[in-house]
Amino acid sequence: MRPLAVAIALVAVWPSGRLAAQTEGSVLTVLPGSTRSAALGGAGAALVGDAGAMFANPAGIATIRHLSLEGSYEPYLAGSAVSAAALALRVRRWTWGVGAQTLDYGSEPVIVPDPATGGRRGMTTGESFHPYEALAATSLVYRRGFAALGVTAKYDRQQIGVEVSDAWAGDIGMAIAVFDIMAVGVSVQNLGGDLGNGALLPRRTRAGLTLNYTDPQGTYRLLTTLEGQWTRDRHAVLVQGVEGGIVTGGVGLVARLGYATRPAVTDASRITLGGGVVLGRLAMDYAFQAYGALGGATHRVGLRWTP
């Protein structure tokens, strides 16, 4: 881990003077749960049909055919890395999902004051510490007709040095999917989530609408998504995304563009870009987001398989 990686990651999400350790105790739970979502500005409440949808709205996995697998990896800020994986299985009206996300800050040697210099310099002990945040979640969804209702139970654990904090929380969500034409989704995330010492998982309400303008099983693809996000003690955010491409014979390319009216509490660009390669039931995704004062950008890659 590069020096100050933990602090930089926190500042990138939360404003200075009010870091996550004070009120909102998680970086990981505010990041997009899938590469497709990341490319569409972080929208996800009404993106249905993939296993990774459970990280934004548990009801989003209700429309999978039988099975869905998804995984992603992103070298994040200051040498840290974000990864996610999810699985969803549908049996009749019920869909069950399980997923995990991690934010790995790498490892750093333990440094203590050097008595030979009167404590003015440090010395390594030969040991190292490995800060991280990890989230495990499971979802259960019931669908009847066009409507679905789902719940998620999640466990978040964070460790920095010898300090460990953890919390249990839950999400609830609903979705209405009208064939492949449109989907409406609403979710409330991180109910509960007390990490102790006044730190809480960020409570967030999301409402979204996704529209398909073409048959998603046909040659041409065109989709838009619009989502409002309301996070506790933060300004509201409106996310807009568009996805389009050409797929023929089960093989094709898609491009994605997202825009989020984020409040000035993060150094991330308001614009996100991405794309993907479609190979039958397998999709390979990519997402890009620039960062200003921190320099550089993030690149996220992912795989989705829906047999």
Predicted regions and their residues:
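Bacterial N-terminal signal peptides
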Residues: 5-15
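Subset of outer-membrane beta-barrel
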Residues: 22-307
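Sec/Tat signal peptide C-region and signal peptidase I cleavage site
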Residues: 17-21
